[in-house]
Amino acid sequence: MDVLAEALRVSGARGALGVVLKAGGTWGLSLDARPRAALHVVSRGTMWLHVPGEKPLEVRAGDAVLLAPGTAHGIAGASRTTLGPCDRKATVQALTDGSALHLGSAPAQTEVLVLRYEQDPEVSTPVLTSLVRPMHVTSRENAQLRKTVELLTAELAQPQIGTTAAVNSIIDLLLVQFVRVWLTRHPETRSGSWLGAMRDPVVRDALACVHARPEHPWTTASLAAATAVSRTTLSRHFRSALGQTPGAYVTQWRMDLASVRLRDTDEPVESISGAVGYASPHAFSRAFRRARGMPPGAYRSRLRR
């Protein structure tokens, strides 16, 4: 079981191309905090990233920088410049017809691909929100990422049949590659960090068991046996890596799976309850109400109004 792939699938983490920025001369753009992650890929020239409380960061051609959901920031052509508001009318036009968004008065010297990643708001597994600080990856330090950026740039430069599908797939690949870089750069396990838990083999193996068989009646004891450690060791690793008990994670994962199925399918509640490990619909409904604040039927109705 590929734990990361399954978590990305269930969390609904999907990327899309926002706009292509072409800028020249003096330019600066202020971007409000949004409930989605942002990835800026510089395909030509140089861009400076401005994040409150951080030093301006130079991002060169072939580099990319990923920002966690809710990160207000600015991008500009210099380390010291005025950041102006986003021209919403021009942005909407660019999003609608696929044209570039032009900034500055001089001919374009810099080109930036602005990508966005959203996570299903009904899912609580914090994949994207684990990326707390801006992460800058240069073209020199990661050959795989460089090739992916080149592929994305080439696909956008010469659109053809299937370009939309290809671009979306490449954007999703970029997210996986950034997660890999994050795991390499942060070998320590930070409490409460879901991605950090991927560095802990005990927790990672336990998550793989839960993700592969959510219907199994998992307990701390059975998970410990499946990962060949004691219950005390398993609990200690979970608290250190995720800030919660094994049982709490199992329940959270089951509720995420159930939430998606309630919204996206017409499966009976009884069928869903068994699929996520509950012996009876009553037990499932009780657990679901505790987690989501309402019974499964009401939850499904609310999302389908």
Placement of each model-derived feature along the sequence:
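Hydrophobic residues on short alpha-helical segments
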Residues: 39, 153, 207, 256-259
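Short helix-to-turn junction characteristic of helix-turn-helix DNA-binding domains
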Residues: 42, 210-213, 261-262
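Glycine- and charge-enriched low-complexity intrinsically disordered segments
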Residues: 100-112
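An amphipathic alpha-helical interaction segment
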Residues: 111-125, 129-208
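Basic/polar phosphate-binding segments, predominantly the helix-turn-helix DNA-binding elements
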Residues: 177-183, 205-256, 273-302
